């Protein structure tokens, strides 16, 4: 076999290997870049912890917004805010840390920022997606799906999912609400922040991407 043929064979094998690795990575789902925790209270009762994985490779701007609001590094954010809208067999919504009723909140980029992309779809329960008031009106409000919500595809930006604590999400989903879907007893994000790799290792290990 000539040197030219050997070189050609080597390049072909290398391209095939790289393609296989790319397809394998893609088939596992979007990459989780950061892990965020919410510690939830309702009244004086601790409901537990929710751990989210953020898809910072697919929607970096949206994921960064959520991360910085969770850490409060800019002097404002999710800590102390409530889940103001809860609809059984649909979703739970929070993130309005200014008005606490769905009319407020702001992003780290200003009041609102555009839809980043709609590459990810609402295919399973436990997805983290941006609430909005129409196209390109993302702020700080988000929701967590409790069922498949495919009718939201192309309208709301999915940017993460629940890794641990779906039982806590279910507790919130089932809480009694008034006619405006607001919980009768406030459901509060008592604490939140960024998890280190060591602290979140188990969450990643058990995640279904």
Swiss-Prot record:
A motif (Prevents secretion from ER) lies at residues 206-209. Gene3D superfamilies: Cyclophilin-like. PANTHER family: PEPTIDYL-PROLYL CIS-TRANS ISOMERASE, PEPTIDYL-PROLYL CIS-TRANS ISOMERASE D-RELATED. It comes from Rhizopus delemar (strain RA 99-880 / ATCC MYA-4621 / FGSC 9543 / NRRL 43880) (Mucormycosis agent). One of its GO terms (biological process) is protein folding. GO terms for molecular function: cyclosporin A binding; peptidyl-prolyl cis-trans isomerase activity. This is Peptidyl-prolyl cis-trans isomerase B2. PPIases accelerate the folding of proteins. It catalyzes the cis-trans isomerization of proline imidic peptide bonds in oligopeptides. It catalyses: [protein]-peptidylproline (omega=180) = [protein]-peptidylproline (omega=0). Glycans are attached at residue 138. The keyword Signal applies. It is found in: Endoplasmic reticulum lumen. The gene is cyp9. GO terms for cellular component: endoplasmic reticulum lumen; fungal-type vacuole.
């Amino acid at each position: 076999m000539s040197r030219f043929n050997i070189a050609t064979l080597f390049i072909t094998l290398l391209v095939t290997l790289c393609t296989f690795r790319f397809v394998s990575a893609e088939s596992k789902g979007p990459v989780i870049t950061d892990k965020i925790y919410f510690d939830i209270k309702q009244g004086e009762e601790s409901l537990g912890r929710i751990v989210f994985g953020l898809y910072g490779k697919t929607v970096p701007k949206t994921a960064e917004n959520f991360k910085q609001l969770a850490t409060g590094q800019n002097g404002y954010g999710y800590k102390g805010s409530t889940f103001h809208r809860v609809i059984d067999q649909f979703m739970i919504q929070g993130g309005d840390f200014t008005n606490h009723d769905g009319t407020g909140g702001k992003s780290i980029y200003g009041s609102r920022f555009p839809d980043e992309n709609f590459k990810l779809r609402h295919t399973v329960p436990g997805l983290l997606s941006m609430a909005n008031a129409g196209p390109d009106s993302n702020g700080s409000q988000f929701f967590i799906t409790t069922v498949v919500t495919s009718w939201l595809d192309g309208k709301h930006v999915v940017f993460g999912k629940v890794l641990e604590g779906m039982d806590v999400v279910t507790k919130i989903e089932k809480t009694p609400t008034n006619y405006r879907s607001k919980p009768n007893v406030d459901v509060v994000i008592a604490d939140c922040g960024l998890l280190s790799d060591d602290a979140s290792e188990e969450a990643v290990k058990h995640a279904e991407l």
